[in-house]
C-alpha cells in the first residue's frame, strides 16, 4: 500500500489509518449483514500531487488515466489563452518570477511525484497538435492516445509514454460528419478494450456517435449513434427534462467506456444520460442522472471500480460539481460526494475521472478548477449520508 503523506492535525492522521485496506475488500457485497447499503468510501488527499517544478502551473485539466504501473497521466490546456497573462503566467510573459504553463502531458506516480512532462505543438513535427487538448488514454503497452475538441480537431494522436510520436488517427482539418469513416468530430474521451484490440472514441463535440478503431493500427472499424441508430447530424436534439430524450445523441458525446463483461457505457452529457450498448452497437438500456440539469449536463465521465466485476461506477458531474457512486447492476446512485469550492475535496467543474489498482479515484477540473485531485479508498462502508460534501474525515468537518 502506498505510504500516506503526513496530513495536518493528529486527528486527521488517525482517521487515515483506515487506509490499510486491501484489494480483497473491493469485492465485498453491496449489502451488509445488517441490510445497510454498502459502498466504497473515500477521503481526499489534500497534499497530492506534489508541487510542480520550474514555476509550472496547470490550465484547464481535461483528461486523466492510470496506466498498468499505476502511473497517473493528466492532460491540460497549456496555451496562453487559458491563463490571465500578467496575473497567472508572469514568468512566461517576462514580467515576474512566476509562473509559466506546464507541458500539456503530466505523468505522476502514486505518491504524487512528477515523473515526466511533455507534449505540445512543435514546428516541423510530423503531427498536428490539437488546438484544444481533450481526453487521454494509456494503452497496456504504454502508448498514449490524445484527443482534441478545438475547431479543426478531427483526429487523434498516439505517442509513446515518453512523448515520441507514433501515428495520427483520422485526417486533421477534415470536414466533420457523424457518418465519416476517415475523420472524427472533436473527440472528447478515449477508452481501450485490450481484450478485443479496440479503441473507443466518444465522438464527440461535433459528431454525435461512438466510433471504434483498431488498437494496433488505428484503422476505422464501426460506429453508432444513440439507441444504436445511424447518426443524423440534422436531427432535432432538444432536451426537455421530464420528457423522452432525443433519438440522437444531444452531445457532447463525452465518454464511451467498455466494461469487463462486454458492455459499453456512453455519456450523452447534454441529455443527462448514460446509454449502455453491446460492443457492436446494440442498444441495451438508458439511465438518467440529475434530469433537471440543463446548461452543460450531468454525465461528464465515468470510471469503474477496479475489482474484476467492476461492481461500481463513479460518475463525474461537472455541472453539479460532484461525484456519484453508482451500483453498476442496478445503475442506481448510492450516494454522492463533493460540492462547489476551492478547498480539497470540493470541485469546480469535475471533468474526467479514473481509478488505480488500489481503488483510489483521480479527478480533473476544467475552467477555473485547473487541477487534479486524489481520493483515497477507505473500503466498503454503510451509506449513512446520501450527499457528502466534502470528503474530509468526520471529526474535521
Positions of PLM-derived features:
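Acidic, glycine/polar-enriched metal-coordinating patches/loops
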Residues: 1
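Eukaryotic scaffold repeat domains enriched in small/polar residues
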Residues: 4-397
Amino acid at each position: 500500500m502506498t505510504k500516506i503523506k503526513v496530513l495536518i492535525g493528529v486527528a486527521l492522521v488517525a482517521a487515515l489509518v483506515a487506509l490499510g485496506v486491501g484489494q480483497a475488500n473491493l469485492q465485498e457485497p453491496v449489502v451488509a449483514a445488517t441490510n445497510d447499503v454498502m459502498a466504497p468510501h473515500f477521503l481526499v488527499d489534500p497534499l497530492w500531487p506534489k508541487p510542480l517544478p520550474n514555476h509550472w502551473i496547470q490550465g484547464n485539466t481535461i483528461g486523466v488515466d492510470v496506466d498498468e504501473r499505476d502511473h497517473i497521466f493528466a492532460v491540460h490546456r497549456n496555451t496562453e489563452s487559458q491563463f490571465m497573462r500578467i496575473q497567472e503566467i508572469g514568468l512566461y510573459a517576462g514580467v515576474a518570477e512566476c509562473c509559466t504553463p506546464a507541458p500539456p502531458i503530466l505523468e505522476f506516480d502514486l505518491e504524487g511525484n512528477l515523473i515526466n512532462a511533455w507534449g505540445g505543438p512543435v514546428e516541423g513535427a510530423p503531427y498536428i497538435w490539437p488546438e484544444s487538448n481533450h481526453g487521454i488514454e494509456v494503452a497496456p503497452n504504454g502508448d498514449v492516445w490524445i484527443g482534441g475538441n478545438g475547431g479543426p480537431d478531427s483526429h487523434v494522436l498516439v505517442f509513446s509514454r515518453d512523448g515520441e510520436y507514433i501515428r495520427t488517427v483520422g485526417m486533421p482539418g477534415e470536414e466533420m460528419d457523424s457518418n465519416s469513416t476517415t475523420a472524427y468530430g472533436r473527440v472528447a474521451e478515449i477508452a481501450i478494450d485490450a481484450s478485443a484490440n479496440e479503441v473507443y472514441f466518444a465522438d464527440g463535440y461535433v459528431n454525435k456517435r461512438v466510433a471504434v478503431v483498431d488498437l494496433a493500427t488505428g484503422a476505422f472499424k464501426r460506429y453508432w449513434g444513440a439507441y444504436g441508430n445511424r447518426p443524423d447530424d440534422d436531427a432535432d436534439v432538444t432536451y426537455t427534462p421530464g420528457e423522452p430524450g432525443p433519438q440522437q445523441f444531444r452531445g457532447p458525446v463525452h465518454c464511451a467506456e467498455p466494461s469487463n463483461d462486454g458492455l459499453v457505457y456512453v455519456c450523452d452529457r447534454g441529455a443527462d444520460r448514460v446509454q449502455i450498448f453491446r460492443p457492436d452497437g446494440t442498444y441495451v438500456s438508458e439511465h438518467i442522472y440529475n434530469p433537471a440539469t440543463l446548461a452543460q449536463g450531468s454525465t461528464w465521465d465515468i470510471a469503474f471500480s477496479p475489482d474484476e466485476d467492476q461492481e461500481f461506477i463513479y460518475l463525474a458531474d461537472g455541472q453539479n460539481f460532484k461525484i456519484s457512486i453508482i451500483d453498476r447492476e442496478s445503475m442506481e446512485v448510492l450516494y454522492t460526494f463533493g460540492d462547489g469550492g476551492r478547498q480539497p475535496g470540493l470541485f469546480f467543474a469535475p471533468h474526467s475521472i479514473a481509478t488505480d489498482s488500489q481503488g483510489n479515484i483521480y479527478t480533473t477540473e476544467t475552467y477555473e478548477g485547473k487541477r487534479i485531485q486524489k481520493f483515497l479508498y477507505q473500503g466498503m462502508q454503510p451509506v449513512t449520508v446520501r450527499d457528502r460534501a466534502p470528503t474530509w474525515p468526520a471529526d474535521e468537518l
